[in-house]
């Protein structure tokens, strides 16, 4: 009891707080400085290699490079990030870790009003900073998920920071941060809209808090209108990116994969029902062989133009099932785009746009006329949602949450070496990224060799992973118990609205972790079929950590509230 009482009374002095934050941040960067890049130029043409090539093009003043079927195929903010790191001579892996540390600091600062003691803010920051998923092997790839979780945290930090301070006239900076996060998250990944439910609900909470202020109606409405600052910054980010695409390729779009005409064409093709009744697998076949044949027989001009490639065995290798010739959902859109490229429709962005517009109109007309057996109109590249997926998705989703909470598959090093020609493939990547590749192998094996010093750093990170794997589950359970226990205290009439907003924010983080896990579970069950993969779930880990830490550390009782100490 004596030690507990002393702990309650003790807190960091401002100087020692910042020194301690600097020390643990420097230690994290030091440990991760021993990590090495994992480069596979020939094995990831749609992922790592694409982003790297785009980054090189940006540094040459050529934006995303010469136009073809891949140029605007993905949301490519990560390529710009790589180019900026190159210009600043910052090693790729260190840059990613620094960005993640900054996002951890912003989320910690966001919750400062309910974490008035510096020691509690320090614990939250440290817990987020040493998240094992942030140093997992997938982060060693040259791919956008290296920074995606950090960008997501900026969104959560920005809107949470504003909601907890919306009665303060100087809180608009948090809305700007939220807008930057929203913009970069969406520009980084096509599924970046997943953060919007949290933002919209949080905006509603902010409006509720502002409505309860003792101010004139006009002043309340002015403050509520400030919420559009985030939307404005978000729109500015997207407009700037689309403007660059307009300048170089003549199309004002973020991507021609997520554009309306490609979604319409893909959706039209997935309307066809021929052969679907024979497919008993959960992995969807968007357009079966019978469906393709039906389009050929119906004399679909624009789809038949792709037949020489879609039905070619060599072309199908890597896209279709070698035994059945069926294109699964996770690869059909890439096969469709590549076949259109071979057919000459990707000479310019405008020609590609016209082709997919014509393809959508033609296929929809055939379906609507009854010439082809088809379902209702749709415009999307996402798999169809049907009742048969409910149980498999729930099963995979809840397993994914357990997978994340127990920090599975988060070793800080790759189990294999980089694959590529050292002189003309790997070396240029090392020079551009200022990060060495793990090319050395143990004698007589294909296993990577790491020096004793590297292994010492890895063992420290592995030990930290074991601590998280044991404690996070317990911390989450305890946090949930405390959150439900304090409901009468938080939600009584005279309690501060800041406490209510913080309580909702923590529950919202848990809800968003569940949402992300279920989203990825659906894609895994219906489209990919590659098994639970930590990279796609890496945005879940920091949300669980933050919810557990804030749920346990936050001051919920009104009489305990002290003036917040800002970071």
Which stretches of residues belong to each language-model region?
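Transmembrane-helix motifs of polytopic, lipid-linked glycan transferases
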Residues: 92-117, 121, 150, 154, ...
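Membrane-interface alpha helices of multi-pass inner-membrane proteins
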Residues: 174-189, 234-236, 241
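Membrane-interface anchor segments at the N-terminal boundary of transmembrane helices
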Residues: 87-96, 145, 355-510
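Extracytoplasmic catalytic/substrate-binding loops of multi-pass membrane glycan-assembly enzymes
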Residues: 36-54, 63-81, 87
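Transmembrane signal-anchor helices characteristic of membrane glycosylation enzymes that use polyprenol
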Residues: 13-44, 131, 233-244, 513-517
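Juxtamembrane membrane-water interface segments immediately following transmembrane helices
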Residues: 41-46, 50-51, 234-387
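Start-transfer (signal-anchor) and selected internal transmembrane alpha helices
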Residues: 1-33, 222-226, 491-505, 560-567
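Aromatic- and kink-enriched transmembrane "portal" helix at the membrane-lumen/periplasm boundary
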Residues: 76-79, 83, 89-93, 127-151, ...
């Amino acid at each position: 009891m004596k030690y507990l009482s002393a702990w309650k009374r003790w807190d960091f002095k401002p100087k020692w707080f910042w020194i301690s934050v600097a020390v643990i941040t420097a230690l994290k960067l030091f440990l991760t400085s021993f990590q090495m890049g994992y480069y596979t130029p020939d094995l990831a043409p749609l992922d790592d290699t694409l982003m790297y090539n785009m980054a090189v093009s940006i540094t040459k003043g050529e934006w995303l490079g010469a136009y073809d079927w891949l140029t605007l195929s993905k949301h490519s903010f990560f390529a710009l990030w790589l180019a900026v790191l190159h210009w600043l001579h910052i090693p790729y892996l260190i840059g990613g870790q620094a960005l993640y540390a900054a996002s951890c600091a912003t989320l910690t600062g966001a919750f400062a009003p309910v974490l008035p003691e510096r020691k509690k803010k320090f614990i939250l920051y440290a817990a987020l900073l040493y998240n094992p998923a942030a140093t997992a092997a997938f982060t060693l790839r040259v791919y956008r998920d290296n920074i995606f979780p950090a960008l997501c945290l900026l969104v959560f930090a920005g809107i949470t920071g504003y909601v907890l301070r919306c009665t303060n006239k100087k809180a608009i900076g948090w809305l700007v941060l939220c807008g930057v996060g929203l913009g970069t998250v969406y520009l980084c990944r096509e599924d970046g809209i997943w953060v919007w439910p949290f933002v919209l609900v949080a905006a509603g909470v902010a409006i509720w808090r502002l409505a309860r202020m003792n101010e004139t109606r006009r002043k309340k409405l002015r403050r509520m209108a400030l919420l559009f600052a985030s939307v404005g910054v978000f729109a500015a980010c997207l407009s700037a990116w689309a403007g660059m695409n307009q300048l170089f390729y003549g199309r004002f779009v973020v991507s021609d994969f997520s554009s309306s005409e490609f979604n319409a064409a893909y959706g039209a093709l997935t309307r066809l029902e021929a052969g679907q009744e024979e497919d008993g697998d959960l992995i969807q076949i968007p357009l079966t062989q019978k469906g393709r044949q039906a389009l050929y027989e119906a004399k679909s001009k624009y789809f038949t133009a792709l037949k020489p490639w879609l039905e070619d065995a060599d072309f199908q290798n890597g896209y279709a099932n070698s035994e059945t010739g069926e294109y699964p959902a996770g690869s059909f859109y890439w096969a469709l785009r590549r076949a259109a490229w071979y057919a000459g429709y990707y000479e310019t962005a405008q020609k590609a746009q016209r082709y997919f517009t014509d393809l959508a109109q033609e296929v929809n007309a055939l379906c609507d006329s009854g010439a082809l057996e088809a379902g209702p109109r749709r415009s999307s590249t996402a798999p169809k949602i049907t009742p048969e997926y409910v149980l498999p998705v729930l099963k995979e989703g809840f397993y994914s949450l357990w997978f994340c909470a127990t920090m599975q598959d988060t070793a800080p090093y790759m189990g294999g070496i980089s694959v590529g020609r050292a002189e003309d493939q790997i070396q240029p990547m090392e020079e551009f990224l200022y990060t060495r590749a793990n090319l050395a192998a143990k004698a007589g094996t294909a296993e990577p060799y790491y020096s004793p010093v590297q292994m010492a750093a890895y063992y420290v990170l592995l030990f930290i992973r074991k601590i998280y794997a044991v404690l996070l589950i317990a911390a989450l359970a305890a946090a949930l118990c405390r959150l439900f226990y304090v409901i009468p205290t938080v939600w009584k009439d005279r309690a501060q609205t800041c406490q209510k907003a913080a309580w909702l924010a923590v529950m919202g983080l848990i809800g968003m972790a569940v949402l992300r896990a279920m989203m990825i579970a659906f894609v895994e069950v219906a489209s990919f079929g590659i098994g639970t993969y930590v990279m796609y779930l890496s945005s879940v880990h920091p949300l669980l950590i933050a919810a557990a830490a804030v749920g346990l550390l936050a001051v919920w009782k009104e009489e305990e509230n002290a003036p917040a100490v800002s970071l």
